[in-house]
Amino acid sequence: MIASSIPAGGHISHGKKEHSGTAGLVHGLDIEFFAFDPEEMTLDVDKTKAKVEDLKSQNRLPKIAMFGGSVFLFPHPVKELADFLKGHDMHINYDAAHVAGLIAGGKFQDPLREGTDTMTMSTHKTLFGPQGGLVLGFDRHEESIKKAMFPGLTSSHHIHHMAGKAVAFAEALEFGKDYAAQTINNAKALAAELNNVGFKVLGEKRGYTESHQTVVNVLDYGDGGTIEADLEKAN
């Protein structure tokens, strides 16, 4: 599988065995990472294509391409890479756990229409519903997804969540576009003010963010773990 590295915003579940990543450590997958452009704060299309070609020459061509992750300020270049990756027989998934509400509100990107085969998502982050998840895709993948979910991964479902999710989806239909837009505006405003008072906010070149997230380089004050602990104590 090829995915974003954790330093580039990928989720730990997409990581290598040696990084305690779920995909590598638990599922035994051979993991490679997309090339990342730190200036643009997103995936580097040309370098990613070159890497895939190099992996092909080593007979290590990934079977899965995983867009999305835990931290990404800007949409991933799905349209720019989808045809290329499919031309190398990869299944393309988009991990929309953190940005599902922004996608539903039409304010981020539209992965399935941009070329992904499937999209996984949370129902409890930017979509503001009860905790849970969904797998979205096309009819051609329906049976394989069903078999993977049961008996492959689950044995039951949480029926008590369904009413809450229905209400959350109804609210998203009514208020989702405005909510997503304001969420992004809030993140931009926070980033700009943090920058104004002297913090090193990443992504300034592109307006800091087009998602709900703001990323700050805290190395002037200490390492990330220490700063996180200090903020927890101060909260």
Show the residue positions of the predicted features:
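Conserved PLP-enzyme active-site core in the AAT-like
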Residues: 2-200, 229
